[in-house]
């Protein structure tokens, strides 16, 4: 499965936030956006703002691909309910993101690797598809051998219990977590490393799908 392999520090500097949770904050050394004219801020057009919000959303979930963004929007556009909430939920409830939220990985990229390398179980069965969509009641756990990984143990030890979303439960001792309920939009937005106007992203995609 394709994944982003580009410079992550440049992305963080572009949005002015350590969005990938790196231990060495790239903004401490270079707080301004990348590029020759990084310190100059130009006024963006409406189209430019839409593009920026879209890129911010993609970055928040580990640089998801454009086609994944479009696919998620198509899946919810004709459903009853809040399109922005259902659209955002498509990314929040991805398996790789749930592994990250539950504290089994320090970063979203580490979570992606855990899933892709076959370390993760869903309801007791191996799932190596990062975009697998979790529904309420589904349990996420790690294989017996995978629980001994130093990166996993360190991540769980350093996990702040207070930062665990209310729609997730985690049993550290058994390396297991569960999605309790479908998260509300404001709950999801509270977990994002930087603010994203999801309605603007949906408006952008509505003209291109």
UniProtKB/Swiss-Prot annotation:
Which molecular function terms from Gene Ontology are attached?
Answer: rRNA binding; structural constituent of ribosome
UniProt record, GO biological process = ribosomal small subunit biogenesis; translation
* Disordered as annotated region, ranges: 23-46
Record's keyword terms, sorted: Ribonucleoprotein, Ribosomal protein, RNA-binding, rRNA-binding
User: What superkingdom heads the lineage?
Assistant: Bacteria
Task: List the GO terms this entry assigns under cellular component, sorted alphabetically.
Answer: small ribosomal subunit
Domain S4 RNA-binding, chain residue ranges per copy: 93-156
What Pfam families would the database entry show? Ribosomal_S4, S4
**InterPro entries noted in UniProt:** Ribosomal_uS4, Ribosomal_uS4_bac-type, Ribosomal_uS4_N, S4_RNA-bd, S4_RNA-bd_sf
Quaternary assembly: Part of the 30S ribosomal subunit. Contacts protein S5. The interaction surface between S4 and S5 is involved in control of translational fidelity.
Classification via PANTHER family: 30S 40S RIBOSOMAL PROTEIN, SMALL RIBOSOMAL SUBUNIT PROTEIN US4M
Main function: One of the primary rRNA binding proteins, it binds directly to 16S rRNA where it nucleates assembly of the body of the 30S subunit.
Stated family: Belongs to the universal ribosomal protein uS4 family.
- Mind telling me what this protein is named? Small ribosomal subunit protein uS4
Q: What is the originating organism of this protein?
A: Chlamydia caviae (strain ATCC VR-813 / DSM 19441 / 03DC25 / GPIC) (Chlamydophila caviae)
């Amino acid at each position: 499965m394709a994944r982003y392999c580009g410079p992550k520090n440049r992305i963080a500097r572009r949005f002015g936030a350590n969005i990938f949770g790196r231990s060495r904050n790239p903004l401490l050394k270079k707080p301004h956006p990348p590029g020759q004219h990084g310190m100059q801020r130009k006024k963006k057009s409406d189209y430019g703002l839409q593009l920026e919000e879209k890129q911010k959303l993609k970055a928040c979930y580990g640089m998801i691909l454009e086609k994944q963004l479009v696919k998620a929007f198509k899946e919810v556009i004709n459903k009853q309910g809040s399109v922005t909430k259902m659209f955002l939920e498509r990314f929040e409830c991805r398996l790789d993101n749930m592994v990250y939220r539950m504290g089994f990985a320090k970063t979203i990229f580490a979570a992606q690797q855990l899933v892709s390398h076959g370390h993760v179980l869903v309801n007791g069965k191996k799932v190596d598809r990062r975009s697998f969509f979790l529904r309420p009641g589904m349990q996420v756990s790690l294989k017996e051998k995978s629980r001994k990984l130093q990166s996993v143990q360190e991540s769980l030890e350093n996990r702040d219990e207070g930062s665990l979303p209310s729609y997730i439960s985690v049993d550290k001792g058994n390396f297991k977590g569960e999605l309790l309920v479908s998260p509300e939009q404001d709950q999801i937005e509270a977990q994002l490393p930087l603010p994203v106007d999801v309605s603007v992203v949906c408006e952008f995609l509505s003209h291109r799908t």
